[in-house]
Amino acid sequence: MTERYIVAIETGSSKIRGAAAVADESGMLDVVAVEEEKLIDSVRYGCIQNIDVSKAIERVCERLESSSALQEGTITGVYVALGGRSLRSDMVTVATELPAEMEITPAIIEDLKAKARAASDASRDVAAVVPVRFTVDNKAQANPVGTFGQSVGARMAVLTCAPQIKRMLRRVIEERLGMKIQDYIVRPLAEAALVLTDDERRLGCMFVDFGAETTTVAIFKSDAPAYLVTLPMGSRNITIDLTSLNYIEERAEEIKRISGNAMPAEGPRRPGVDGIDYSEVNTYVNARASEIIQNIVAQLEYAGMKAADLPGGIVIVGGGARLRGFSDLLGKHSKMKVRNGAVTGSVRISDSHINAGDYIDVISILQAAARLPETECVEFPEETETPEHTADGDYESMYADADDDEGTSRIGRGYDDDDDDDDDRRRKRSRRDRQEKGAPQRRRTAAKDDEFIDDDITDDEEMHRSSGIFSKLKNKLTNIFDGDGDDNFK
């Protein structure tokens, strides 16, 4: 398979996002469509709270299917992002003794991962197992595969989440929509893989995903995650603080986005032309932003590290990171260099209307999915051969199948309507084929499922229609070969 279509879904606290991309064998990812649906209070701290999420995902998928890149395709599977407050990382040490000195194979490493998975908290779902450090015969080994030894040990980061996270995702996607969840992908790890440089990961850095309701902090050292935690606070906390100034939440969010500044206000308070005292607004913004930043910086101590241990600095992503002055304030408190994460060159954006920096979350899921075993997320209808035009005068072959339903419908109708009917028939045949094969298929609303097909024509009506057709044919032939028509052959 030279290329394949990948679809990713990210269920955030403020919106549902979906994206489609084409991945090729070279590792290049071409993002062809991104859609989102605003949704408030249906997802809280990473966990789905309301079945409305299912409808939002369906609308997002329908818009993706309507894009030029996926025209006539049907989304049958998706990769889903995992994140939220319940996501945590635990370090587990495992080892295995080999019967004799032998080559370390990938199967042995997978066995170590299975042991780490089994050693995790049984009350939680395992989201990912990431190797941090290996030893072969008690000696550190960066990549043990291909080396020889009699014992292999590993320190693994086991990322887990609350069971209801996956359970609710299955309920709204697989049970309600009939689409298959191809795999779950831990969003913070995927985002870090997308925006961090090799030097930052090897030297050591802090990755921060500042979202609407949660903030995830991950520390990388020696090219592996050494620490990960999700804090139950985000940019929405700032918005809620501003509602105490007698603004509804939507207006408070708008004021924060347009005029908010995390850096402390300088000079006397001056009301704006719209009567809003922005100095007072930014006093609230600075107070809450400072609290969030203090909690971010405190994770260094909890991880047993200092700022000097992370020469790669801090890389920040997420909607909250766009707050004016937040990166500067974070650098001031942490005494570390701070930069905003950006999409790397391995990802190409086909649609010029897509600002890659605004969609790092869902694009990172696409990139992570492209590195997994090949699975198709989009099914296209089988191409049908177009019959060749019949030679002039070959009346018998032209009308041999005139009594066929599909052939009959072409006579006396415009070509545009005819083509639309052919497309509808192909889509229906494609859906029937998927049902017969047992392939997953997204459920449609009744208004879109109940496409009209005139199956109630009686035998008498059909005979009358056929009789009319052949009557027209007879008149046509008569006009050709009557006295007037003979003039053409003189």
Question: What spans do the regions from the language model cover?
Answer:
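Glycine-rich phosphate-binding/hydrolytic loop that grips phosphoryl groups
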Residues: 342-396
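Conserved, well-folded catalytic cores of nucleic-acid-processing
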Residues: 63-67, 119, 176, 245, ...
